[in-house]
Amino acid sequence: MAKATQDSNRPHKADVGSAIPNHDLPPIPGRYHADREELLEFYRRMLMIRRFEERCGQLYGLGLIAGFCHLYIGQEAVAVGLQAALQPGRDSVITGYREHGHMLAYGIDPKIVMAELTGRASGISHGKGGSMHMFSTEHKFFGGNGIVGAQVPLGAGLAFAHKYRNDGGCSAAYFGDGSANQGQVYEAYNMAALWKLPVIFVIENNGYAMGTSIQRANAHTALSERGAGFGIPALVVDGMDVLEVRGAATVAVDWVQAGKGPIILEMKTYRYRGHSMSDPARYRSREEVNDMKENHDPLDNLKKDLFAAGVPEAELVKLDEDIRQQVKEAADFAEKAPLPADEELYTNILVGKY
């Protein structure tokens, strides 16, 4: 059984990746100092993703969500911590097919996300995107991309647009450890470095590319170091700690907005469920998964900070109840919403008449 040695790879503090001769390096970020309200907001968004994805799993089992469905459970701290440093309406986000969490982390209404998952006209992509292809120019969320690694050059392109327009924005391009082996990723690295584009390349390293562990697929597993040949600095971050992620995100945003070019953030994280809903994940042991849940869970990690800040357990219980109700309302809304009209087949296409 192939096993991803997450414990040995995950740093306790964010650290700078491989040294790059004759180049500036970003400072080593500290753990973000959040006040009580910020801690609660981080927890609320992470818990929303967790409960939303759990409900997605149920709806998929009932046949209300069709096609592929990739859940974000376990990785919540990455999207929430990183996107808390971005400015909605200015900065762009693009990711792969495991996208629900990124949309919710950006504050997008769970009702229209759930409606999209169930193929309804009121979904954020009018029922045509489904789980893998959600899209919203209004929110500067550019997918949801089903082709492995294809979002990375698009993320560099979004950064080019920000630089060309001189609007002060940057782009965050998320991809996984499996995507990191795609050739187009290195083409994007090269152009982003050459043109000093304001792009944050976010590697969500959850240890497995579908069912293949990182050790079986990579001759060199330090993914953060792969940008060194292009002069791109990197930070390796504990992606199970939202405050570590938030601290690294601040450094990354400051770096790209200072005109220093791209930066890589390798987030050491873990997904609790299989690659998709059809994956029983027999390639890893139950003990491995349970260890991550019991000893490294991002919500439990943040709870310690909340308790230290004086937040009582009862307040978190009430917050969980409220979020469960919001998720229920989102699911009810999605189930009752109408399906798209037949005419919707002919919208948003390149050629409408032959």
Curated annotation (Swiss-Prot):
Keyword list, A-Z: Oxidoreductase, Pyruvate, Thiamine pyrophosphate
Catalytic activity, EC: 1.2.4.1
GO molecular function, one term: pyruvate dehydrogenase (acetyl-transferring) activity
Catalytic activity: N(6)-[(R)-lipoyl]-L-lysyl-[protein] + pyruvate + H(+) = N(6)-[(R)-S(8)-acetyldihydrolipoyl]-L-lysyl-[protein] + CO2
Pfam families per the UniProt record, alphabetical: E1_dh (PF00676)
Gene Ontology biological process terms from the UniProt entry: pyruvate decarboxylation to acetyl-CoA
InterPro entries found in the cross-reference section: DH_E1 (IPR001017), PDH_E1_Alpha_Subunit (IPR050642), Pyrv_DH_E1_asu_subgrp-y (IPR017597), THDP-binding (IPR029061)
Annotated stretches, region: Disordered: 1-29
Top-level EC class as recorded in UniProt: oxidoreductase
Cofactor: thiamine diphosphate
Gene Ontology CC, one term: intracellular membrane-bounded organelle
Assembly, per entry: Heterodimer of an alpha and a beta chain.
NCBIfam families noted in UniProt: PDH_E1_alph_y (TIGR03182)
Function per UniProt: The pyruvate dehydrogenase complex catalyzes the overall conversion of pyruvate to acetyl-CoA and CO(2). It contains multiple copies of three enzymatic components: pyruvate dehydrogenase (E1), dihydrolipoamide acetyltransferase (E2) and lipoamide dehydrogenase (E3).
Name of the protein in its database record: Pyruvate dehydrogenase E1 component subunit alpha
Organism, as annotated: Zymomonas mobilis subsp. mobilis (strain ATCC 31821 / ZM4 / CP4)
Originating gene: pdhA
